[in-house]
Amino acid sequence: MMSVLSDQLVTFSILAYLVAMVVHAVEYALGNARVRVGPPARELVGAGVGAAGGAGSGPEPTDGAATAAQRTAARARMAGLGAVAVTVLAALLHLGALIARGVAADRMPWGNMYEFVLTVSFIGVASWFVVLWKRPTLRRLGLFLTLVMVLLVATAELLLYTPIVPLVPALNSYWFIIHVATVVFSSGIFLLGVVPAGAFLMRAGYEQGRRSFPYLLAKRMPAAAALERLTFVLHAFSFPIFTFAVIAGAIWAEAAWGRAWGWDPKETWAFISWVVYAGYLHARATPSVKRNVASWLAILGFLTVMMNLFGVNLFFEGLHSYGGLD
């Protein structure tokens, strides 16, 4: 019963994230809309008037044009608030699916790839609400976040779904809660962090005068400096948690397998992720390193996390090969 409910809630959450993405796109489109301003009405002036005052002065918005611009801005704002409301609904459905899954399994819902992806993506969207509460001006990033949510949750539902089964013996430990919880939480923050990192690269290019794709998408994004700052804050917050997760995993491995580190594929890729993210923070703190270089390192770090999640579980054999897929 609870398992079926969880599956249904996941499906509804995907649809809700999709609707939120569309409404965010409407806000984006309205924000890019231009109000046509007609030429000013001709006036009869004296022969000596206009040489100084009229030359070079462009058309000024009429009252009608100003009103139209205000209406468009109001509609864009309403669409943005509506998109946030639908995203909240999607996140509640998402959370309900995780709770129902945990109740049905009588354990934390982190036992396989399907459950892990659902949990990481939920942490990402929940963290987004905290960012939005602190920085409402960043709302338009929601378009790209909801796109990521649709892709991840739909991938979990369509390709990674696994019926509820008991945990494999290797996971029956209190370290399961400690290690996996910190991995899930830090991965969710890294997921959110890659969104402003990519947005920064587009916005920085737009501010430098680039008008080709994809830089034109950044026309209505927040300022590049704000996006870059958010990228740093999220990664600086998540990196110590991820570091603890790696250490906790080594302690658990010592207790379970008799060695703390054996260069198992998942351990190797966790180390690669740690090195890349450490490199990002070092680059970010080095004045001589350009911000776009540091942002590319943040994106590379997330790609290594995705490799560790999908690639290692699907293509490698090791002690961590219990992703739940046949």
Language-model features and meaning:
Residues M1-D326:
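Polytopic transmembrane helical bundles with strong interfacial aromatic enrichment
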